[in-house]
Regions:
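Preference for protein termini
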Residues: 1-469
Length: 469
């Protein structure tokens, strides 16, 4: 099968797109050895700064550098404005869905989404039922994963509402590009992103009804794959980075242990999953959480960002209903479309999936990080048949989608520059207002032909420029 990919830098006639012309001129005039030297400098600087991630399942548990590519992904400002509006619209609808789900459940009563699809979902938290949240916001920090098909149309691949990660790489990639190639930023107007930590802190503070709430970042600890990001964001916001053992609950209030005695905590930006937050309420074996945290939360004495139970809205089995959520709650047409999705829990759609596995991408509804998925066109017959057996055994645990022709962007590889597939994760902050920092994290599949961009699967990152037209 011949696939047509949308190239971010070159049009169908091989001409450089207008928003890339300045970069293309610079690239043509810059000696190859200088580019190679700067790339080596970037690797060294990232290593010194500790910009790493830990690969789960790695026997050595080693920290790895996320490969950084110095050819940016560039988006014209006019195009970005549409993407931005689409992301804001989508996250607003998802927050309205969560408010409705944990209160009146109008969308279920209207027959738009089946009750069992959400109420039997393992991410649904009965403890949240009837609990009112300040501003009715459940997902304060959201990541919306976008891809472009062969004709350049943006699609939402998935929503990330639990503990979306990657924003630290977005910020560090920009700092690295400005340090190594300042002349590029002097030659054109590229939207800044360095104000993200200030926006994040403002969002977290606005999540509390208090005038000047105390904010902390709760991390599972240094062995977590995203620990660098937890420490980075706490430092950039000027707030404390804490582990569960640093906090305790007394009289349904959360306190932080300090050398000066207990200090009240009002907002927790938590970077661990629901199951580990409170051993008294969730997983009793958790050593990462804070005993009594749920009780304090239900009393309204502490804010958790993101809220407990947000995961039900970004579950892949709920994803097919998001465009209907937009119509139901906002009375608007979706600006960004979903990828067509087959739900294996439905017998007719299951039959279609099983008959077309070599052409489809199949995902576990609870999967993440590029794990638990089948990319049909890139799989062997044995891999496809093994996955077929898994789907038949538990069809409700899988969805399937057509294999998209993900857009490509020129990327440095071992033997020069070649196109590699990319996606985009803009970060949406929901507080007094809903805001998106221009661009986001561009992830790139460095292996030739690969469509999997996750760092856990060998993917890298690029700086993302929003360039004035």
């Amino acid at each position: 099968m011949i696939r047509t990919y949308y190239d971010e830098m070159y049009d169908g006639a091989g001409q450089v797109r207008p928003h890339y012309r300045e970069f293309a001129r610079w690239l043509a005039d810059t000696p190859a050895e200088l580019l190679a030297q700067r790339r080596r400098e970037a690797d060294l600087l990232f290593h010194r700064a500790g910009i790493t991630f830990t690969l789960y399942g790695d026997e050595q548990g080693t920290e790895r550098l996320i490969p950084f590519d110095t050819i940016p992904r560039s988006i014209p400002a006019s195009e970005w404005r549409v993407v931005e509006r689409g992301c804001i619209q989508r996250v607003k609808a998802l927050n309205l869905f969560l408010t409705d789900l944990y209160h009146d459940q109008r969308i279920i009563k209207a027959g738009i989404i089946p009750a069992e699809q959400v109420l039997a979902n393992e991410q649904y938290q009965l403890a949240m039922q009837g609990l009112d949240l300040h501003r009715d916001i459940y997902s304060h920090i959201s990541g919306v994963d976008l891809v472009r098909d062969g004709d350049g149309t943006y699609y939402v691949l998935e929503d990330n509402l639990r503990t979306p990660s990657g924003v630290s790489y977005m910020l560090e990639d920009r700092k690295m590009m400005m340090r190594l190639f300042p002349e590029l930023f002097a030659a054109q107007r590229i939207a800044p992103i360095d104000h993200y930590p200030n926006l994040l802190l403002d969002t977290l503070k606005s999540a509390s009804p208090l005038d000047n709430p105390s904010v902390v970042v709760l991390t599972p600890g240094r062995f977590n794959s995203a620990f660098f990001e937890h420490a980075f964001l706490a430092r950039e916001m000027g707030v404390e980075l804490v582990e569960g053992a640093d906090l305790f609950v007394r009289d349904d209030r959360v306190f932080m242990r300090t050398t000066d005695g207990p200090k009240a905590v009002d907002v927790i930006y938590r970077r661990l999953d629901d199951a580990f937050l409170d051993p008294l309420a969730f997983n009793p074996d958790s050593m990462l959480g804070v005993p009594g945290l749920l009780a304090a939360y239900r009393c309204g004495n502490v804010v958790l960002a993101n809220a407990i139970g947000t995961g039900v809205a970004d579950d892949k089995s709920v994803y097919p209903f998001v465009t209907e959520m937009i119509r139901f709650y906002l009375d608007e047409e979706p600006i960004l479309q979903n990828v067509p999705t087959f739900q294996c829990r439905k017998p007719d759609e299951l039959s279609h999936v099983l008959a077309n596995l070599p052409d489809l991408v199949v995902k576990e509804t609870q999967g993440s990080g590029g794990y638990g998925m089948l990319v049909g066109p890139a799989s062997t017959t044995a891999e496809i048949e093994a996955f077929r057996a898994r789907i038949k055994a538990k069809p409700q645990a899988y969805i399937a989608q057509p294999t998209l022709c993900l857009s490509t962007c020129p990327t440095f590889v071992e033997n020069g520059i070649a196109p590699r597939h990319i996606d985009l994760r803009p970060f949406v902050l929901s507080g007094k207002e809903t805001r998106v920092v221009p661009g986001g994290l561009t992830r790139v599949a460095l292996r030739e032909g690969s469509l999997v961009v996750n760092s856990s699967q060998g993917g890298g990152t690029k700086d993302t420029w929003v360039v004035e037209d």
